[in-house]
Amino acid sequence: MAPPTRLQVPRPGTAVPYTVLLGWLLAQVARAADTTGRAYNLTWKSTNFKTILEWEPKSIDHVYTVQISTRLENWKSKCFLTAETECDLTDEVVKDVGQTYMARVLSYPARNGNTTGFPEEPPFRNSPEFTPYLDTNLGQPTIQSFEQVGTKLNVTVQDARTLVRRNGTFLSLRAVFGKDLNYTLYYWRASSTGKKTATTNTNEFLIDVDKGENYCFSVQAVIPSRKRKQRSPESLTECTSREQGRAREMFFIIGAVVVVALLIIVLSVTVYKCRKARAGPSGKESSPLNIA
């Protein structure tokens, strides 16, 4: 009599782990298929309200459409079916720089120019929220002019233009931020490295310096009320020059001498003509008569 056949029971750690591993692999494949070409790493790049949304990846088999909205508005589509990985949203965010904006990037498989057959609900990725007034970076300021006269140094910062409009006119950075915008001046003797600072909520500085010393300086835009992105990069460094100051003084001295000389000449000619005009009639009356 043959012995009964024993039932083969899977050993722990063999068939079950294989099943789990297979399920995990299928899940990873499904995830990869779902995310291939889908936009990610959405980033706002904004300076002085010039605002661009960037994302990844640079795909050859997907195109993208960007949508933007505020918290109370419907989505508005921009940059339709673009193969690029950036979209300029400046014209939308400058409408109200105090609003908070949200954007999302929809991903579509490329169709060689054929826009039919796209899914009604394509995969998309949301951006972080963006409030232009709080989140745009301050651009590098420019020193418009400077002059050192004696113990006074006057520095004027150029009022940068933005793409924010009011009544059809582009506003300056000062017009947008008002007194929230400060400038810090860093200045030092050209012969030393010890820096001093001055701050103003206008675009001009007038500071006391040592007479006869050259000074170097730079400026930086600051919004103290912000929690982040408070400061701009520093401007290019400018320096005064005693030679320039002396040349300016000589120019004014020479100009004054020329003006005085011209006045003397004009007065002399005028006096001469007046005397000649007076002497003419009297000379005729006193001349003897010619008797034939």
UniProtKB/Swiss-Prot annotation:
Keyword Secreted (UniProt): no
Cystines in this chain: 79-87, 216-239
Lipid moiety-binding residues (S-palmitoyl cysteine): 274
Topological relation to the membrane, as annotated: Single-pass type I membrane protein
Location in the cell: Membrane
Residues the record marks as carrying a glycan: 41, 114, 154, 167, 182
One Gene Ontology molecular-function label: phospholipid binding
Transmembrane residue ranges: 251-271
Record key words, sorted: Blood coagulation, Disulfide bond, Glycoprotein, Hemostasis, Lipoprotein, Membrane, Palmitate, Repeat, Signal, Transmembrane, Transmembrane helix
A GO CC term assigned to this protein in UniProt: extracellular matrix
GO biological process, one term: positive regulation of TOR signaling
Domain named Fibronectin type-III: residues: 35-126, 148-240
Pfam families: Interfer-bind, Tissue_fac
UniProt topological domain (Cytoplasmic) ranges: 272-292
Chief subcellular location: membrane
Extracellular-side segments: 33-250
Function: Initiates blood coagulation by forming a complex with circulating factor VII or VIIa. The [TF:VIIa] complex activates factors IX or X by specific limited proteolysis. TF plays a role in normal hemostasis by initiating the cell-surface assembly and propagation of the coagulation protease cascade.
Protein name in the entry: Tissue factor
Lineage: Eukaryota, Metazoa, Chordata, Craniata, Vertebrata
Protein encoded by which gene: F3
